[in-house]
Amino acid sequence: MPLDAATKKQIMSEFAQKEGDTGSPEVQVAMLSRRISDLTEHLKTHKHDHHSRRGLLILVGQRRRLLQYLAKKDIQRFRALVDRLGIRRGAAGGAK
């Protein structure tokens, strides 16, 4: 389920490192987290939508890889992002 432009803009302004930042790991993880939460809500209603479930698993894996990258590059930014989004730290492959 794609995000609309207003939601993307709001997420970018909230998590951007500087003006016009669209590609930092923080922004990417925040957008993926929003899509994951939207798909999770969809799957609560539509339990047999296996195509969307596969898409959800792909998004979760992509977010996990981005979090692993951020934890390896800058652990303080990783911890701040995880706390801000309310993600379990185990989501990044055990980086604590």
UniProtKB/Swiss-Prot annotation:
- Extract one GO molecular function annotation from the record: rRNA binding
Task: Return the protein name.
Answer: Small ribosomal subunit protein uS15
Q: How does it assemble?
A: Part of the 30S ribosomal subunit. Forms a bridge to the 50S subunit in the 70S ribosome, contacting the 23S rRNA.
Q: Which GO terms describe its biological process?
A: translation
Q: Which Gene3D superfamilies match?
A: 6.10.250.3130, S15/NS1, RNA-binding
The organism encoding this protein is Streptomyces griseus subsp. griseus (strain JCM 4626 / CBS 651.72 / NBRC 13350 / KCC S-0626 / ISP 5235)
NCBIfam families, sorted: S15_bact
One Pfam family matching this protein: Ribosomal_S15
Alphabetically sorted, this entry's keywords are: Ribonucleoprotein, Ribosomal protein, RNA-binding, rRNA-binding
Q: Which InterPro entries match?
A: Ribosomal_uS15, Ribosomal_uS15_bac-type, uS15_NS1_RNA-bd_sf
State the similarity comment: Belongs to the universal ribosomal protein uS15 family.
GO CC annotation: cytosolic small ribosomal subunit
What is known about what this protein does?
Answer: One of the primary rRNA binding proteins, it binds directly to 16S rRNA where it helps nucleate assembly of the platform of the 30S subunit by binding and bridging several RNA helices of the 16S rRNA. Forms an intersubunit bridge (bridge B4) with the 23S rRNA of the 50S subunit in the ribosome.
